[in-house]
Amino acid sequence: MTDVQCEPALAGRKPKWADADIAELVDERTGRLDPRIYTDEALYEQELERIFGRSWLLMGHETQIPKAGDFMTNYMGEDPVMVVRQKNGEIRVFLNQCRHRGMRICRADGGNAKSFTCSYHGWAYDTGGNLVSVPFEEQAFPGLRKEDWGPLQARVETYKGLIFANWDADAPDLDTYLGEAKFYMDHMLDRTEAGTEAIPGIQKWVIPCNWKFAAEQFCSDMYHAGTTSHLSGILAGLPDGVDLSELAPPTEGIQYRATWGGHGSGFYIGDPNLLLAIMGPKVTEYWTQGPAAEKASERLGSTERGQQLMAQHMTIFPTCSFLPGINTIRAWHPRGPNEIEVWAFTVVDADAPEEMKEEYRQQTLRTFSAGGVFEQDDGENWVEIQQVLRGHKARSRPFNAEMGLGQTDSDNPDYPGTISYVYSEEAARGLYTQWVRMMTSPDWAALDATRPAVSESTHT
């Protein structure tokens, strides 16, 4: 027996958007965004299929499931999945759905198991997702081919400890998908030969906003950090003896837009005072001076990359975001067009002193967590925007995303990709351009045809 694809019922759903109409929602040339991309239910349904159904999505960190049988549950879009370490050390990701009536195979957040049994009718699966036992099989299901009734398996690949999964067999491998973005990810993931480890625990909370607001901010928006958005958190975190006048936003920095793919990042260069106000003196000293920082400079190829990049933000399209230096990593799981579920954890250098690991844990809880002082600022802004967009007139005029238009460098000797000033929306335009590409391309062959005919940078 072979699987048959079942089309979802369309009753009560709005008709799909035509590709030509989707293409008009984002104007990269002028930096205009149609607000309906954040609210339209039909667009969201197409996102689940065309973006979340064929992008590489963050599943977690390898150290969260170190032993055979270790597992954690997660999501790919709105599809629940299981992430399981196998006996041979590999990791499998499969749909957390029993093939009998669609119940979750596993309802726990994580743990260690030798098998998984559906709580509805007792169908049992091994840690690889293979159906191994069916109650009353001989009497009730004579001739059942159990090998045909395992859950849908995803592709799994890792990059320096981070686990990613993809439903699409035709998607490029993870290394190709990340491209030059790996250069910027390494500022957090490759500071030491020991790599990174995840601090135990995942924080989860809900924000009533569209996923693209969160992804875009971490991709492109240092602008809000340099104005008034986080002023209260900065004031609350000022170390003793430091005056606010000493913490004027740095003026030197860059923003990175992926040549292709929608990834983006940005950071200040040189001035550590903003990091000091966010993470305190212990983390700032660890990041900027001493043996660990010097080792990072050697591995990353320059003192600037190892010790002088501050307050970096980054998004791997579509929904994997992180803040090197602060070291929070999160996935923005969509829950309809008007809500996200945030899953966040913290990584540290695996060979960092235990007291530094504890300092990172405490500081990320204070700053970027469900109750973090900076997290609250961001969430409040996104929620308020989403509420305003309930109005008809509020959705009737385009948003302005033209900051930094025409002010880019695609041949920077130190940093790969398209480079602009730190206060820019170049990376945001890249994210939304990739959104249009994926929403209007029928398959990965069509997507690959949109790649620029240039070789990838050789920066290391």
From Swiss-Prot:
Binding site for Fe cation: H224, H230, D378
Positions bound to [2Fe-2S] cluster: C98, H100, C118, H121
InterPro entries: RHO_NdoB-like_C, Rieske_2Fe-2S, Rieske_2Fe-2S_sf, Ring-hydroxy_dOase_2Fe2S_BS, Ring_hydroxy_dOase_asu_C_dom, Rng_hydr_dOase-A
A Pfam family recorded for this sequence: Rieske
GO molecular function per UniProt: 2 iron, 2 sulfur cluster binding; biphenyl 2,3-dioxygenase activity; iron ion binding; monooxygenase activity
Cofactor notes: Binds 1 [2Fe-2S] cluster per subunit.
Domain Rieske: start-end pairs: 56-165
Name of the top EC class for this enzyme: oxidoreductase
Biological pathway: Xenobiotic degradation; biphenyl degradation; 2-hydroxy-2,4-pentadienoate and benzoate from biphenyl: step 1/4
Assembly description: Heterohexamer consisting of three BphA1 subunits and three BphA2 subunits. The multicomponent biphenyl dioxygenase system is composed of a ferredoxin reductase (BphA4), a ferredoxin (BphA3), and a terminal oxygenase (BphA1A2).
Protein's recorded name: Biphenyl 2,3-dioxygenase subunit alpha
Species per Swiss-Prot/TrEMBL record: Rhodococcus jostii (strain RHA1)
